[in-house]
């Protein structure tokens, strides 16, 4: 129903009427989307392109069965992360999925990335053609240390944790709508994972004569936001990929 409360902000006598319409709409959207995107048999459906044969149909079925097994049984975070993403989507308008190979788990993982944690240039129209894509990653010291021991990140000393920094108006508003309120410090670090094109000395693109072409190549550069220290630079392309 409609609730009413006396308010003095932003001015005396301001309307204090509230109604859970947005919460109801979000819940309905989440429930309907979850049913469509995560059916009981698994989210993957395969289709044979071209004239189907018994062999290609059997191959497609094997791919479908394996992918659904991978997502529903092995990737334990896929279901709850997707469920959470579908709750955020109607509130923020955009959400992202990040699927990558996790060195500590030694398997593919699927992570929900809120819109406020994905930073692109203002002129970008999509992620594929954006000159730079930065994922704001919040990670505990223990998880960072695991990656340092595994050789993924440089073994360098990090600055003090920066979990108390402002996370932005979008995050604050979405937490307010969800009824969330942080009541403790999780001592997390903020890392910036930048997907960017670089022309690194000693790793230049070569032309047919073996000379540097001057073409920048895609890399992933991860750094600690607080100290500015680079933790890793990794190649984001295969040798056979087109320029």
Regions found by a protein language model. Name each.
Residues 1-242:
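Extended, helix-rich architectural segments
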């Amino acid at each position: 129903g409609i609730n009413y409360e006396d308010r003095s902000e932003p001015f005396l006598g301001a309307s204090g009427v509230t109604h859970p319409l947005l919460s109801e709409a979000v819940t309905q959207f989440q429930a309907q989307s979850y049913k469509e995107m995560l059916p009981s048999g698994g989210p993957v459906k395969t289709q044979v392109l071209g004239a189907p044969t018994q062999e290609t149909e059997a191959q497609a079925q094997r791919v479908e069965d394996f992918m659904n097994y991978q997502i529903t049984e092995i990737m334990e975070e896929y279901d709850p992360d997707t469920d959470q993403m579908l709750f955020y989507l109607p509130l923020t308008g955009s959400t992202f999925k990040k699927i990558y190979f996790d060195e500590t788990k030694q398997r593919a993982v699927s992570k929900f990335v809120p819109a406020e944690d994905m930073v692109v240039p203002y002129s970008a129209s999509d992620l594929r053609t954006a000159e730079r894509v930065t994922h704001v990653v919040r990670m505990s010291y223990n998880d960072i240390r695991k990656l340092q021991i595994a050789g993924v990140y440089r073994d360098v000393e990090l600055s003090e944790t920066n979990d108390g920094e402002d996370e932005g108006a979008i995050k604050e508003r979405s937490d307010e709508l969800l009824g969330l309120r942080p009541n403790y410090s999780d001592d997390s670090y903020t890392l910036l994972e930048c997907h960017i094109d670089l022309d690194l000395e000693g790793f230049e693109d070569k032309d047919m004569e073996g000379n540097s072409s001057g073409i920048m190549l895609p890399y992933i550069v991860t750094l600690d936001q607080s100290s500015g220290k680079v933790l890793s630079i990794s190649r984001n392309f295969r040798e056979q990929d087109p320029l």
